UniProtKB/Swiss-Prot annotation:
Coiled-coil annotated spans: none
The name this protein goes by in its record: DNA-directed RNA polymerase subunit omega
Name of the gene: rpoZ
Record's keyword annotation contains Zinc: no
Keyword Iron part of the UniProt annotation: no
Native source species: Helicobacter hepaticus (strain ATCC 51449 / 3B1)
């Protein structure tokens, strides 16, 4: 895992959702629920070491989770 600062990760994640911070918050919330229910992280981060929102934001920043993947499950 590279060592991006939290601000850099947040900026990349925000860019992925067209700078819509409300959409980003929703996407993080939905992904945190999935991770909390036992979904495996899509990035190399241990759920026992890192907070679930940090993992979710990293996944979004790296393009591993997109809005359509959450919408399809509803």
């Amino acid at each position: 895992m590279d060592t991006l600062r939290t601000e850099e990760i947040a900026a990349k994640a925000l860019k992925r959702v067209h700078n819509d911070r409300y959409l980003l918050a929703s996407l993080i919330f939905e992904r945190v629920k999935e991770l909390g229910e036992g979904a495996k992280p899509l990035v190399d981060m241990d759920v026992k070491t890192y907070k679930l929102p940090d993992i979710a934001m990293r996944e979004i920043a790296e393009g591993k989770v997109e809005l359509t993947s959450i919408e399809d499950r509803e």
